[in-house]
């Protein structure tokens, strides 16, 4: 870990289906696809472990070379304010708060239990998506609903993409030579899911996602902020079945819902700029505008901003989105350099002019490194 070197990377897809497969890459070498039916997470991790020790594809000689396993866990609720070593008590608590994010949380637990079954003595660490945001003050995380609902059901803003916001905010300060604990930063993690965070003097003071990852800015298939009265109105007009509401707000809305084209920004940009489709163009304007509004709001919340960071798949690759968000904000101290921005992909780069009061920078995220570093730190103790 002293070198932060990636020995291998990959992932298993379609667990539980006949056409499940493992994507594997040894270092920077050729990518391999191993097709094998994996009925559950235990079988998936068995294949991962056998691949890591394989004579041709592997990077370790035996499983004893593995010192620990780190897990990205969606939700830590109010119980986990930082990464923790996993034990039976932690597993029970993760399961207890699973209703806050049932799909992801149960999958996270399956991975933890599979490792425990296969390598029972191996230390495991949980790194929570929500933990970095636990410094948000109560006036920012509470919803304006009866307080008893917060007390009974823990309904509040939690925020997500925590490892990404943590990594890129610190890395941006390293690149710019700024003291992280004396800097006001707005981080924009923009991918198919998107969230912003306001970080003041090393602590998150607000973030755009809420109880679930659906709140906040417009996303690929999620609606983001919406008047909740829309839903009883749709129900009363038989335009939406209450049973379909979750699917409606999470999978049918956002850029996909408005454009009618795709949730993939590349497809939508082609429709807007090449085929001149009005709905596609509208969805892009809405997307940029809503992110820009949050940038302005967080500047107000912190009484200023020193650094604006773009990351995530679109934030790292999408010069059109970065332009739409950061241009024409001169009165807020942002002098955007579109010459540097245009065509920039997957590189650490300052994209504001030297005279800009607010530095704008692209920082590719590295959530896996955060998980590895936290795992190392906790298992070294």
Residue ranges: model-predicted function:
Residues 71-74, 190, 309-317:
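Glycine-rich beta-strand-to-loop/alpha-helix junction loops that act as flexible
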Residues 52, 56-104, 125, 131-142:
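Short beta-strand-loop/turn "lid" adjacent to the catalytic site in phosphate-handling enzymes
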Residues 1-38, 210:
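Short glycine-rich, Thr/Ser-proximal phosphate-binding strand/loop in the N-terminal lobe
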Residues 247, 254-258, 265-301:
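Adenine-nucleotide phosphate-binding core of ATP-dependent small-molecule kinases
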Residues 200, 206-241, 247, 312-343:
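Catalytic phosphate/nucleotide-handling subdomain of diverse soluble enzymes
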Residues 132-237:
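Glycine-rich phosphate-binding loop of actin/hexokinase-like ATP-binding domains
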Residues 281, 285-309, 315-381:
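Internal helix-turn-beta structural module
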Residues 51-67, 172-179, 295-306:
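Phosphate/pyrophosphate-binding loops at sites that engage ATP/ADP/AMP, CoA/4′-phosphopantetheine
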């Amino acid at each position: 870990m002293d070198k932060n070197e990636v020995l291998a990377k990959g992932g298993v897809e379609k667990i539980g289906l006949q056409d499940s497969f493992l994507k594997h890459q040894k270092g920077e070498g050729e990518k391999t696809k191993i097709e094998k039916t994996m009925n559950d997470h235990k079988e998936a991790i068995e294949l991962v472990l056998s691949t890591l020790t394989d004579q041709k594809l592997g990077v370790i000689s035996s499983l004893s070379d593995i010192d620990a396993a780190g897990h990205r866990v969606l939700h830590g609720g109010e119980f986990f304010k930082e990464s923790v070593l996993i034990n039976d008590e932690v597993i029970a608590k993760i399961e207890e708060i699973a209703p806050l994010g049932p799909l992801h949380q149960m999958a996270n637990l399956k991975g933890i239990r599979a490792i425990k079954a296969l390598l029972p003595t191996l230390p495991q660490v949980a790194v929570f998506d929500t933990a970095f945001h636990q410094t948000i003050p109560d006036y920012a995380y509470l919803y304006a609903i009866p307080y008893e609902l917060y007390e009974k059901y823990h309904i509040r803003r939690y925020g997500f993409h925590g490892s990404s916001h943590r990594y890129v905010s610190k890395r941006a300060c390293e690149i710019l030579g700024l003291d992280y604990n004396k800097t006001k930063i707005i981080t924009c993690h923009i991918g198919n899911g998107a969230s912003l965070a306001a970080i003041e003097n090393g602590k998150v003071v607000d973030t755009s996602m809420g109880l679930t990852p659906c709140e906040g800015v417009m996303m690929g298939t999620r609606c983001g902020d919406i008047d909740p009265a829309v839903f009883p109105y749709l129900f009363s007009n038989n335009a939406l079945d209450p049973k379909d509401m979750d699917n409606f707000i999470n999978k049918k809305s956002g850029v996909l819902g408005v454009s009618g084209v795709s949730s993939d920004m590349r497809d939508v940009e082609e429709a807007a700029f090449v085929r001149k489709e009005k709905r596609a163009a509208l969805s892009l304007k809405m997307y940029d505008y809503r992110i820009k509004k949050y940038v302005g709001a967080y500047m107000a919340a912190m009484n200023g901003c020193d650094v604006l960071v773009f990351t995530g798949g679109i934030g790292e690759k999408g010069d059109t989105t970065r332009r739409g968000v950061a241009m024409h904000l001169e009165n807020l101290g942002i002098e955007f350099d579109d010459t540097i921005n245009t065509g920039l992909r997957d590189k650490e780069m300052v994209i504001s002019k030297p005279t800009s009061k607010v530095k704008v920078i692209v920082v590719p995220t590295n959530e896996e490194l955060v998980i590895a570093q936290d795992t190392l730190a906790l298992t070294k103790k």
